[in-house]
Amino acid sequence: MLTTTIPQFPDTKLYISLFRNVSNAPEIVDSLAELPYSIIDARTLLSREQLLSAVYRAMLEKHCNKLRTRNLHTEVLLCLSPTSNVMSQIGDAMKRFGIKKDSTSVVLVKAVTGDETFDPKGFSEVIRGEELEFSDTALRESADIDTIRENYKLKCFECERLEELSAALVHAIQLRGL
């Protein structure tokens, strides 16, 4: 599990975990509305930087009172999306980046602000699977490059290294809506 803060938001602590061999994805999908986390299909993530970029953008939207979703955790999924089409954008982001019934690797994100308490063991109470270190190496083992390229409309983008693709993903996230 990664526990971190973003320098611009020192009062918000982030807990991020990667799980593989998840055996209860259908149950999680059915109870998503009650869970206070962002739950992302790890096939759609290539790097820590990609996810942290979306988290930063979601926190910025919250700080400016511009959330387009009901909470920060859903906003993270929306911020992963490179598209700025407001129509059906939230549903599309959930379909593209959220946990699916066939997901076997997932990333959970919990943002804790102020006096709110959180027990990190809560992740393993929700997910039946093996918790891994949240690292670029572990994410790349789960990443589906074709799905990522399709989600970000980068099918023709040529790159020699995955770091270049990761940078393109971060740019797409940060430039969306400008």
Curated annotation (Swiss-Prot):
Single GO BP term: positive regulation of transcription by RNA polymerase II
Pfam hit, one: CGI-121
Localization (cell): Nucleus; Chromosome, Telomere
Gene Ontology MF annotations: tRNA binding
Annotated InterPro entries: CGI121/TPRKB, CGI121/TPRKB_sf
Main subcellular location: nucleus
GO CC terms: chromosome, telomeric region; cytosol; EKC/KEOPS complex; nucleus
Keywords in alphabetical order: Activator, Chromosome, Nucleus, Telomere, Transcription, Transcription regulation, tRNA processing
Domain of life from the UniProt record: Eukaryota
Protein role: Component of the EKC/KEOPS complex that is required for the formation of a threonylcarbamoyl group on adenosine at position 37 (t(6)A37) in tRNAs that read codons beginning with adenine. The complex is probably involved in the transfer of the threonylcarbamoyl moiety of threonylcarbamoyl-AMP (TC-AMP) to the N6 group of A37. CGI121 acts as an allosteric effector that regulates the t(6)A activity of the complex. The EKC/KEOPS complex also promotes both telomere uncapping and telomere elongation. The complex is required for efficient recruitment of transcriptional coactivators.
Family affiliation: Belongs to the CGI121/TPRKB family.
Oligomeric form and interacting partners: Component of the EKC/KEOPS complex composed of at least BUD32, CGI121, GON7, KAE1 and PCC1; the whole complex dimerizes.
Name used for this protein in its record: EKC/KEOPS complex subunit CGI121
Native species: Eremothecium gossypii (strain ATCC 10895 / CBS 109.51 / FGSC 9923 / NRRL Y-1056) (Yeast)
Gene coding for it: CGI121
